[in-house]
Each structure stands twice: as C-alpha cells, then as structure tokens.
Amino acid sequence: MQIVNISAYKFVSLNDIETLRPEMRSRCEDLELKGTILLAPEGINMFLAGPRESIDGFMAWLHADTRFADIAPKESLSDNQPFKRMLVRAKKEIITMKRPLIRPEEGRAPSVRPVDLKRWLDQGHDDEGRPVVMLDTRNDFEVAVGTFDNVVEYNLTKFSEFPDVIEARKAEFEGKTVVSFCTGGIRCEKAAIHMQEVGIGHVYQLEGGILKYFEEVGGDHYRGDCFVFDYRTALNPNLEPAGPKQCFACRAVVTAEEQQSPHYVVGKSCPHCVGRHDQAAA
C-alpha cells in the first residue's frame, strides 16, 4: 500500500491547545495516521503519514477550523510508513529560536514563489536589479546533503544559533536581496521575520522551502539532495528517496559512497563515528 507523507505548518495564534491537543490525537488515531504534530501559542507544525483516504480525511477535518483553512500541505509518496507512532505535543515554539515568539497577527514575512526565485537566479538579480543572496537556515549536517549554488550558510548546529550569527553579519547584506530557505518553510519564515526585526532591508522566505521548489521547478540552481527528518533521509529533486542514509549511532548523514565503507554497519557505526566508538571502548 502506498503511503502519503505530508508536512505543513502555520504561524497562527492558538490559545486552546489544551483542548486542541487531545482532539487532534483522537482524530489521527481514528484514521490510523502516524507522525508528529507540534502545537504552540505561535502556531502548528505537523508531519503525518498514512493511506490517501486517511490523509484526506484528516485535512478535511482540519480545514473545517477557520484558523487552519488555508493550510496546504506538501506531499510525497513512499512504500513504507516512515513513523513509528502518533505524537501530538504542546511546545513553547513550533520551531525553537529562543527569541520572542512570532506574533502571527502582525502578518507573515514576505515570500518569493519558487518560479520567481528561479527567474531571479537565472538572470542573476531580483526584479529591481539587486543581487540575490541565498541564505541557508538549516543545520550543518543538512546542508552537507545538498543546497543551492553560491549559498551563504553558517555551519549551524541548531537553529537557535541563527539570531546571534545573523545579527553579527547583517552589514554583509546591505543593498542585496536575501532569500532565506529551509526544508519546508518554517525555519526560513521565522528567520526572515527575525532578519526584518534586526534591520535587514530586503528579505524574503522561499515559499514552501526546498521541497516546494523541487515540486514546482525541479533542481535548477541546486546541487545534491534535500535532507528530510524521517527514514528516507534525503529526497532528490524528483522528490524520490535519494542515496544518503543517516547513521543511527551518531546521526551523521552517510553518503552512498560512505555506505560502501567497512566502517558502515547499519545501526552500529559509520565512517564519521567508528573511531569515537573505539576510543570510548578503550
């Protein structure tokens, strides 16, 4: 049976999480869905997987709530269920930045559609003639799997490092158009809002993130694959599972070439961590 995988988020004020959480969990369990839903005062972030009729049933139920009526999930298909259980969690933030919460009532960050971004990258500037800077807001191990050409990235180990890094370097973006991007849109939207707040003038988020870019325009101006947080590890520009895998011992991304190493033992070690294991055992 083919499994439909969806991801979606929305920054929207939620003040009824104690009621919403059990309702969502019950609905997902009734539909035999698996995955994770995060609820916070600033919004919702969800990753779900299940049969087509179950996914459609949940989205119809969700859209009946006017706060979520415009949520449009990104989809991909797999032969297996990528999640082991169904979790609905209450959090302080739907993506952790450890800065003041997003205020949804003040509006979203400006966004650029994938087709428009491709045009900018094709022509070498935005529609007003400003140079375009592609800013990767993901963690370093995700960037290693694939990213846009000529990207700016800061070797982040966690997203909460982003504010301090960007505030120290904001002068580098003067006179340029900055397009922040991430896997599905949530981190780059929060990053874009923060950049506006610290005075960076021309900031956009990539609408729908890398996965939406793949879906609408393919892999132009992008090199490699896109890391995803489930058993597939990475998707190529055709939104198909790609070669890299994740080491369950150290969480490093293991390329197809590295998987040929004798140090790569599924569930035990990989070339990135085998030496550390040996030292720990000594």
UniProtKB/Swiss-Prot annotation:
Keywords, comma-separated and alphabetical: Oxidoreductase, tRNA processing
Q: Which residues form the Rhodanese domain?
A: 128-222
Oxidoreductase among keywords: yes
Q: What is its EC number?
A: 1.14.-.-
Q: Which GO terms describe its biological process?
A: tRNA modification
Q: What class of enzyme is it?
A: oxidoreductase
Q: Which InterPro entries match?
A: Rhodanese-like_dom, Rhodanese-like_dom_sf, TrhO, TRHO_N
What name does the UniProt record give this protein? tRNA uridine(34) hydroxylase
